[in-house]
From Swiss-Prot:
It is found in: Cytoplasm; Nucleus; Cytoplasm, Cytoskeleton, Microtubule organizing center, Centrosome. The modification N6,N6-dimethyllysine is found at K561. The lineage of its organism: Eukaryota, Metazoa, Chordata, Craniata, Vertebrata. Induction: By heat shock. Its main location: cytoplasm. This is Heat shock 70 kDa protein 1A. Residues 617-641 are annotated as: Disordered. It comes from Bos taurus. In response to cellular stress, acetylated at Lys-77 by NA110 and then gradually deacetylated by HDAC4 at later stages. Acetylation enhances its chaperone activity and also determines whether it will function as a chaperone for protein refolding or degradation by controlling its binding to co-chaperones HOPX and STUB1. The acetylated form and the non-acetylated form bind to HOPX and STUB1 respectively. Acetylation also protects cells against various types of cellular stress. The keyword tRNA-binding does not apply.
Length: 641
């Protein structure tokens, strides 16, 4: 069965994405860079052909021979006004071959010309290989998506590209239809439904209105702007910072291609950050003539820079409604597609236009189309699993998420492979007396010690009222939403003071390979980790016992119940152990255990005499596990069991 699996491919203008339906759910497949979307770029050099990330990464060095936007050419005539106007903006050459456009490049020292279908087929081949690498066997069957407004020749040309790539194209389906399938809107079974798909991608903006009745999809209207997308928002940011650089440093970087390219990459990253944070910082070393460019931008400023572009997205929505002869109150579902729909302002404008209606956005917007294509592919291959009949979307956290407790121990709140969205809360406390604050350091990874894991971010919770160690209660909450965005909040229960950090699933975090490597390494290191964990645990137990004994015999309530000689004996021994601990933080587990036995031999007889005399507070009740003590600079947190 597994061998004749079918994949779903979203062949995008700027990015493509591939998914497969297996084990009862859709899996969006990451490429060798760990990215779940792959640039629709093909580059030709003196020595090789590059596709995807590798092609996009070298575009600044090789602009004439790096081809993108093939989707704007496919199935069109050379004389088409669209082709003529687009040609003005491309760094690569487009030539006329019998009124068919061809892209001319230099490859291995020769001049070559390729049809758009050939360029698209190279991207499709890449997507096919990404799926094969993941599934571990050859894949031939595929469903490929196209915009709803594609005409027959554009559809046929896309199918041809699939054939050139060695695919058996089961069906070409509309992108908005795929998105609606992804959300299972064809299975609500409530009679006819009108669905508006708002698709704002990297280079294009499409609005489609579909009517779904009993599993039948009908496109009622399409509208949009073939030249509006994420790249335009990047351009606004680039222009803004070019001007800022002029003001700050009296230099114009706009003619330096490499500087502008580096600035653009930083702007794209800042734009993504601003979807989940209200501010983003850019740090570009030696951007131009050795000048470092460090700056920041707020979400409000970004929204202002792009306000006319954002507002212009509503015009096609109104046009599509008019064409479909529908009133906005007659739309049942609103679906967001395309990475740019993550921008909060875009969501708000659409939501306000529809009088506060909820938006369907639980599936990653860049992945919704490939997701639906994968479901359609499974159906066409005759997949009978009931999940295809009623599909439920469940994403998972790929790595454990937690924080550092005393001694550098990784304390996981969200275990790997937990389904998201999810929320976990745990109580921690202070590690030293009168500690004024705690440093919350958030890590991801599978190792026992945080130094072997990946630091995602840190923040401090200060203003904790003075109290003995172990008394304050700090509630830490890890909350991941459906987009994989993590919010960590720490609250001091006594004062209600809180602080938080938001960590977005920036694709630059860890690739699938790194996750695999971490998991495999974790197996290998498990034994070492276990030894280390036991060592820290033994150290903490000893330290805890020594401090507890010390405070027990110093307790005012014991005055007169314990002889000064006994008290001195306990205090001296405790002090000796505490000093030894400071000098031997890296001792082995059995040394810590041996020291603890020594200390117990001194303390136990005295404590038991005390009990026979009075039944005072027992030191044993302090829990051998004790606080997760340890070295390390700055305020630390420990876990309360």
């Amino acid at each position: 069965m597994a061998k004749n699996m079918a994949i779903g491919i979203d062949l995008g203008t700027t990015y493509s994405c591939v998914g497969v339906f297996q084990h009862g759910k859709v899996e969006i497949i990451a490429n060798d860079q760990g990215n779940r979307t792959t640039p629709s770029y093909v580059a030709f050099t003196d020595t090789e052909r590059l596709i995807g990330d590798a092609a996009k990464n070298q575009v600044a060095l090789n602009p004439q021979n790096t081809v993108f936007d093939a989707k704007r050419l496919i199935g069109r005539k050379f004389g088409d006004p669209v082709v003529q106007s687009d040609m003005k903006h491309w760094p690569f050459r487009v030539i006329n071959d019998g009124d068919k456009p061809k892209v001319q490049v230099s490859y291995k020292g020769e001049t070559k010309a390729f049809y758009p279908e050939e360029i698209s087929s190279m991207v499709l081949t890449k997507m096919k290989e990404i799926a094969e690498a993941y599934l571990g066997h050859p894949v031939t069957n595929a469903v490929i998506t196209v915009p709803a407004y594609f005409n027959d020749s554009q559809r046929q040309a896309t199918k041809d590209a699939g054939v050139i790539a060695g695919l058996n194209v089961l069906r070409i389906i509309n992108e908005p239809t795929a998105a609606a399938i992804a959300y299972g809107l064809d299975r609500t079974g409530k009679g006819e439904r009108n669905v508006l798909i708002f698709d704002l991608g990297g280079g294009t903006f499409d609005v489609s209105i579909l009517t779904i009745d009993d599993g039948i999809f009908e496109v009622k209207a399409t509208a949009g702007d073939t030249h509006l997308g994420g790249e335009d928002f990047d351009n606004r940011l680039v222009n803004h910072f070019v001007e800022e650089f002029k003001r700050k440093h009296k230099k114009d970087i706009s003619q330096n291609k490499r500087a502008v390219r580096r600035l653009r990459t930083a702007c794209e990253r800042a734009k993504r950050t601003l979807s989940s944070s209200t501010q983003a910082s850019l740090e570009i070393d030696s951007l131009f003539e050795g000048i470092d460019f460090y700056t920041s931008i707020t979400r409000a400023r970004f929204e202002e820079l792009c306000s006319d572009l954002f507002r212009s997205t509503l015009e096609p929505v109104e046009k599509a409604l008019r064409d479909a002869k529908l009133d906005k109150a007659q739309i049942h579902d609103l679906v967001l597609v395309g990475g740019s729909t993550r921008i909060p302002k875009v969501q708000k404008l659409l939501q306000d236009f529809f009088n506060g209606r909820d938006l369907n956005k639980s599936i990653n917007p860049d992945e919704a189309v490939a997701y639906g294509a994968a479901v359609q592919a499974a159906i066409l291959m005759g997949d009978k699993s009931e999940n295809v009949q009623d599909l439920l979307l469940l994403d998972v956290a790929p790595l454990s998420l937690g924080l550092e407790t005393a001694g550098g121990v990784m304390t996981a709140l969200i275990k790997r492979n937990s389904t998201i969205p999810t929320k976990q809360t745990q109580i921690f406390t202070t590690y030293s007396d009168n500690q004024p604050g705690v440093l919350i350091q958030v890590y991801e990874g599978e190792r026992a010690m945080t130094r072997d894991n990946n630091l995602l971010g840190r923040f401090e919770l200060s203003g904790i009222p003075p109290a003995p160690r172990g008394v304050p209660q700090i509630e830490v909450t890890f909350d991941i939403d459906a987009n994989g965005i993590l919010n960590v909040t720490a609250t001091d229960k006594s004062t209600g003071k809180a602080n938080k950090i938001t960590i977005t699933n920036d694709k630059g975090r860890l690739s699938k390979e790194e996750i695999e490597r971490m998991v495999q390494e974790a197996e290998k290191y498990k034994a070492e980790d276990e030894v280390q964990r036991e060592r820290v645990s033994a150290k903490n137990a000893l330290e805890s016992y020594a401090f507890n004994m010390k405070s027990a015999v110093e307790d005012e309530g014991l005055k007169g119940k314990i002889s000064e000689a006994d008290k001195k004996k306990v205090l001296d021994k405790c002090q000796e152990v505490i000093s030894w601990l400071d000098a031997n933080t890296l001792a082995e587990k059995d040394e810590f255990e041996h020291k603890r036995k020594e200390l117990e031999q001194v303390c136990n007889p005295i404590i038991s005499r005390l009990y026979q005399g009075a039944g005072g507070p027992g030191a044993g009740g302090f829990g051998a596990q004790g606080p997760k003590g340890g070295s390390g600079s700055g305020p630390t947190i420990e876990e309360v069991d």
